[in-house]
Amino acid sequence: MANAVGRRSWAALRLCAAVILLDLAVCKGFVEDLNESFKDNRKDDIWLVDFYAPWCGHCKKLEPIWNEVGLEMKSIGSPVKVGKMDATSYSSIASEFGVRGYPTIKLLKGDLAYNYRGPRTKDDIIEFAHRVSGALIRPLPSQQMFDHVRKRHRVFFVYIGGESPLKEKYIDAASELIVYTYFFSASEDVVPEYVTLKEMPAVLVFKDDTYFVYDEYEDGDLSSWISRERFQNYLTMDGFLLYELGDTGKLVAIAVIDEKNTSLEHTRLKSIIQEVARDFRDHFHRDFQFGHMDGNDYINTLLMDELTVPTIVVLNTSNQQYFLLDRHIKDASDMVQFINSILDGTVPAQGGDSIFQRLKRIVFDAKSTIVSIFKSSPLMGCFLFGLPLGVISIMCYGIYTADTDGGYIEERYEVSKSEMENQEQIEESKEQESSSGGSLAPTVQEPKDVLEKKKD
């Protein structure tokens, strides 16, 4: 009986493994491996391509998601083909498309190449492909179509009117920013009745259950205005969003909380930020972005400081400055006063991108890297840092002892040289004495003895 149960369990496991392998094979079957022929054969189709490197860890994480993207695009009958290319093997093609890092996702449409900079999730990548592969400016022929778009998209832009210089600017902005948001065009009778326009033509953004009209005098360049307005007024923040918000020029007011903590203080600060974003939209939406962030890990890295949770911080992502609370925030009116104090300059900014802050950033990043390595793998940390330190220590010891031995040899050389000079001087003096003694011998007469005297 036990053997029979074991055999059935083993058969079930093998069946599950076979199903998983079959799913993987099916998913991979809808993602084409591209080679050098892709350069010449691609222009008749629209391609969504993942440029990867075999050794890249982020590329390996993206691979199963990319296979799901290929399967989904095929199942819905999308005209976009999904492929992947080893950018290290076909580096010339990757360079031609402007690949600078791995993985790089691009949608190739004719002679145009669009970079994907969003979250690496299946739904976000597929939405990007649909948005960019379609028409640059999509027409809204009826109010029913307008209502459908309104329900489907959280943020979208609409040009209302006929041919004009403003429409040309709108088309230019759309060609640059289509990777981020949707662009539509409509006639005045298609727009809902609650939309009031002072003049025509006009460009509007619909978001947060309301709309805003572009004013060239107050808002400046159209592309810059679209870049600022392409986000909802209140967002759940993460590192990617903060990076994207750096292009808007807006200050970002964030409630840093622990979403798992349901205490009053955490929910209160989040509610205050939401209330200010909603009720003071007309006052601050040009200059401020609002949201909350779960946890303080990313903020601590950005500020190079340890923030207590919960708290509120205002970031200037364009120059890395930040503002911390100078008062206790009781309600939305206190938060409004704090924001106004930032705008009028009475609250001092901290951080920045000065030379000192850059040096501080280098030291902080190095310290954080070392700490993270030792936390994740102490043995690896000891090997990575202990081995180089040991080699450097041995080299320093060798250099020091070499200098000492060299000094000793040099000193002995000097002593030997002086001894030789002394010896030469002694020998020279002896030679002089012997030579002087030989020259005096013939002139000195020895005393005669008695017999010699008698002979004389």
From Swiss-Prot:
The active site is at 56 (nucleophile), 59 (nucleophile). It comes from the Eukaryota. Its main location: endoplasmic reticulum. One of its GO terms (cellular component) is cell surface. It is a single-pass membrane protein. Glycans are attached at residues 35, 261, 316. SUPFAM superfamilies: Thioredoxin-like. It is found in: Endoplasmic reticulum membrane. It is an enzyme of class 5 (isomerase). Residues 30-378 are lumenal. The keyword tRNA processing does not apply. A motif (Di-lysine motif) lies at residues 453-456. Disulfide bonds join 56-59. Residues 1-29 form the signal peptide. Pfam families: Thioredoxin, Thioredoxin_6. Keywords: Disulfide bond, Endoplasmic reticulum, Glycoprotein, Isomerase, Membrane, Redox-active center, Signal, Transmembrane, Transmembrane helix. Its EC number is 5.3.4.1. It catalyses: Catalyzes the rearrangement of -S-S- bonds in proteins. Residues 400-456 are cytoplasmic. Belongs to the protein disulfide isomerase family. PANTHER family: PROTEIN DISULFIDE-ISOMERASE TMX3. Probable disulfide isomerase, which participates in the folding of proteins containing disulfide bonds. May act as a dithiol oxidase. Acts as a regulator of endoplasmic reticulum-mitochondria contact sites via its ability to regulate redox signals. The di-lysine motif confers endoplasmic reticulum localization for type I membrane proteins. This is Protein disulfide-isomerase TMX3. It comes from Mus musculus.
